[in-house]
């Protein structure tokens, strides 16, 4: 089954600056309509799976299709046989089933029926080191994660972190992934950015417009 999400590749607000591994994501993504989703299933996903099966290599696992929505419809940018990052952080916050059971069922060929998903909207905002995706410094002390996770539904996932002299410090370009759930994208954004404000490290950078296009679409 297809689960829709939207990534934000550019490092700065407004999709400006160089591309990164991803500065944030949200799910579901209203930019992909139900009609477009059916088109993706019929013209992209099913032919790939059918072709692999016909060649004696039936696919089992996670198939990530990176798409661009154009005036001519969805166009494929890339395929990955893994979750996207930070797409996974947003998508998996909505998964009600046990991920290990799902993965083992896929491996054994026992995965049938629909997975169960929370109805809420999920969002992930990446906190990055100054200079990313170029040269950046490491070893900056991180504070405020416990306070951030006091915001309802917020969970903070570590990426480029390490412990040095008993303190949590930065150890990569993308440092933390702050996630939240909400009844809609508006509430999810309010929660995640309230949590982001409680986290600090020297040179911390993040986009302030993750999910903003979905808010504008929601409000018409």
Language model features by range: what are they?
Residues 4-88:
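Internal nucleotide-binding/catalytic subdomain
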Residues 12-14, 112-114, 161-168:
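Short beta-strand/turn micro-motifs at beta-sheet edges
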Residues 17, 24, 74-75, 122-125, ...:
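Structural motif
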Residues 40-63, 80-151:
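Active-site "cap" helix and flanking loop/linker of ATP-utilizing ligase/carboxylase catalytic domains
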Residues 68, 126, 143, 155-160, ...:
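Residues in well-ordered beta-strands of folded domains
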Residues 138-177:
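Generic long, charged, amphipathic alpha-helical segments
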Residues 162-165, 169-220:
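Generic C-terminus detector
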